[in-house]
Amino acid sequence: MALKTYKEILADIDTFLFDVDGVFTDNRVLLYAGLDPVRTFHSRDAYAVQHAVKEGVRIVVITGGRSAGVAEAFGRLGVTEFHHSVPDKSAKLDELIRVTEAHNSFI
C-alpha cells in the first residue's frame, strides 16, 4: 500500500482552524495612543486564506483578542467564522469539533 502524497492528504481536509497572534502575525504589536493595538499580517497569508475560501475550504479563526481591525480584515478575506474574546481557545476548539464532522487541520 503506497503512502498518500501531501496533495492527496490535503484533498481530505475541508476545515482549517487558526489562532491569530503568532500564526498570522509575528507577535509584534504596535501601540498607539487612542487606537486599538495594531498587528501586521503577511500578504501571502491573506492571499492563501482568500484562495482557500474561494475553493470552498472552511476557515475558522479563534482568538483571545478583540480587535475590530483584525475582525474586519478576516471578513474582507471571506472568513465568516471569526470567534474573538475567547478566554479558553481549547474549549472553543472542542466545541467546534463536536458540532461538525469536518476533517480538520489544527495550526
Each model region followed by its residue ranges:
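C-terminal cap/substrate-recognition subdomain and adjoining C-terminal extension
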Residues: 15, 69-107
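Short, flexible loop segments at the rims of nucleotide/cofactor-binding pockets, characterized by
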Residues: 1, 36-39, 83-85
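A metal-dependent, Asp-based hydrolase signature
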Residues: 15, 20, 28-29, 74
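Non-catalytic pre-domain segments flanking phosphatase-related domains
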Residues: 1-20
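A short acidic/small-residue loop/turn micro-motif
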Residues: 31-34, 45
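Short, acidic loop-to-helix structural element flanking the phosphoryl-transfer center
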Residues: 38-55, 87-99
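Substrate-recognition element of Asp-dependent hydrolases with the DxDx(T/V) motif
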Residues: 49-73, 84
